[in-house]
Amino acid sequence: MPENPSSSPTEPPEQSAAFEKWRSGLAQFTGLGLSESEKAERERLKAQGKLAKDWDKCEGWKRDLMNYSPMITFLLNHLKLAGCPFPSSAMQCHPCPENRAGGFSPDHGILLCQDRFFNKKHMEDTLAHELVHAFDHCRFKVDWGNLRHHACSEIRAANLSGDCRFTREVKRGFYAFNKQHQACVKRRAILSVLANPACTSPEMAEKAVNEVWESCFTDTRPFDEIY
């Protein structure tokens, strides 16, 4: 019996499966033609892949800095000399909210915000900043609930880490040639103290920073001078 000309020939199963695989792959690549659940899964996998990529980069930079950065190796050595060796495991790479690059906790060590670094130099400055806090906590027994203590460590960390170098300030939109470094250190110290739960106002943060400014800005330990 002749075939009905209006009917379509049935595709072999393997050909149909190959087409579906191609269609699905194209949809995943472009995002077009996906169901809502498929779109959600696609975004989840993309985010998961980005997290893994950011973590790998952060860990790689951390290893490089611990081995080859004069600033970081110097601070790590002085932490060890002070009786507080700081292993790699105490410096953790994690994703963070915006406007944060790192942090120090006496209980948990150093946080490195893996998705917030512009480049390795930015990470070096951040790690140096947090290692100054670690050094202060070890060497001077900082009470982080005491705003004057906190202010002093923030002044020292901003002053010594490279966080306030001129090029960083230009990127932040601050342009001044007269005492720009001091202005940056004070501004950033006040912002950090303001985030302390014991601080209830910008005026309180500024007062704490001003009260310890002279002694803490000139205290460059463990460096002989500003790096």
UniProtKB/Swiss-Prot annotation:
EC numbers, comma separated: 3.4.24.-
GO molecular function: metal ion binding; metalloendopeptidase activity
Residues reported to bind a divalent metal cation: 129, 133
Coiled-coil regions, chain positions: none
Transmembrane segments: none
InterPro entries, A to Z: Peptidase_M76_ATP23
The keyword Metal-binding is assigned to this record: yes
Top-level taxon in the UniProt lineage: Eukaryota
GO cellular component, one term: mitochondrial inner membrane
Chief localisation class: mitochondrion
Subcellular location: Mitochondrion inner membrane
Active site, UniProt feature: 130
Biological process per Gene Ontology, one example term: mitochondrial protein processing
Mode of membrane association: Peripheral membrane protein
EC top class, as a word: hydrolase
Chain's role: Has a dual role in the assembly of mitochondrial ATPase. Acts as a protease that removes N-terminal residues of mitochondrial ATPase CF(0) subunit 6 at the intermembrane space side. Also involved in the correct assembly of the membrane-embedded ATPase CF(0) particle, probably mediating association of subunit 6 with the subunit 9 ring.
PANTHER family with a match to the protein in the record: MITOCHONDRIAL INNER MEMBRANE PROTEASE (PTHR21711), MITOCHONDRIAL INNER MEMBRANE PROTEASE ATP23 HOMOLOG (PTHR21711:SF0)
Family: Belongs to the peptidase M76 family.
Protein known as: Mitochondrial inner membrane protease ATP23
Gene: ATP23
